Amino acid sequence: MLAIRLSRGGSRKRPFYHVVATDSRNARDSNFIERLGFFNPQARGQEEELRLDLERIEYWQSQGGQISDRVKSLIKQYKKSANK
């Protein structure tokens, strides 16, 4: 089954997450089909905190992709900030 979820990157004590489309059986940080955006929970200064490609997320969802709870909340947050 296809999953749209977070994949952790960054260094110790400074996480950085990529939003990826991947097979749900794959390990969290292993191979992915497509990178759909990123989330930087500890953005500093001018660093961007969140960027998502909503068109591609909708495409993968139409192909049967299951969106994780955390990614759903990030999409909601992204849409809210885009309306400002």
From Swiss-Prot:
Disulphide-bridged cysteine pairs: none
Keyword Ribosomal protein: yes
Gene Ontology BP terms: translation
GO CC list: cytoplasm; small ribosomal subunit
Any one GO molecular-function label of the UniProt entry: structural constituent of ribosome
Keyword set includes RNA-binding: no
Keywords in alphabetical order: Ribonucleoprotein, Ribosomal protein
HAMAP family, per the entry: Ribosomal_bS16
Similarity field: Belongs to the bacterial ribosomal protein bS16 family.
NCBIfam families in the record: S16
Protein name: Small ribosomal subunit protein bS16
Organism, scientific name: Dichelobacter nodosus (strain VCS1703A)
